[in-house]
Amino acid sequence: IHSDFIYQRTINTRRVLNLLLYLNSDWKEEWNGYIELWDKKMTKKISSLSPSLNNMLIFRTDKDSNHGFPDKLVCPENIARKSIALYYYVEEKNSLPIQIKKRKYFTTVWKKRPNTNDPEFMDRDNLWRKIKYKYLPRFFLKK
């Protein structure tokens, strides 16, 4: 489960909306792949949605919009979980407030579900340390 990054610092915009449209005809429940929405404190699952054809999910993007499909896909090798993701951004008129200039608003934040065996790499700080300089282009690291 994760919450998406909010600010795109390089173009001074803020993501405010996510739209996910699923394109999978005849998706079977036993294949997993259901998207889950979790509460702000990650204490309970609020809802889940099958990735079946024409199912659509629209939600606000903020630091507490916890979502994802955490269970391993078990569909046949010739089947893929297909979706279209659209994001709506607004321009930030002023420079970002100092309290927002924290790393967590510029990266996806991975979160562990309670009472699960979600892997340790889901910890945001450990993940960030592992990938920061190894994989990110230099322009992401400026400022």
Regions found by a protein language model. Give the residues of each.
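Histidine-centered divalent metal-coordination motifs
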Residues: 2
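Catalytic core of Fe(II)/2-oxoglutarate
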Residues: 6, 10-15, 28-142
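Eukaryotic charged/polar low-complexity linker/IDR segments
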Residues: 18-20
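Glycine- and acidic-residue-biased ligand/ion/polar-headgroup-sensing regions
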Residues: 23-25
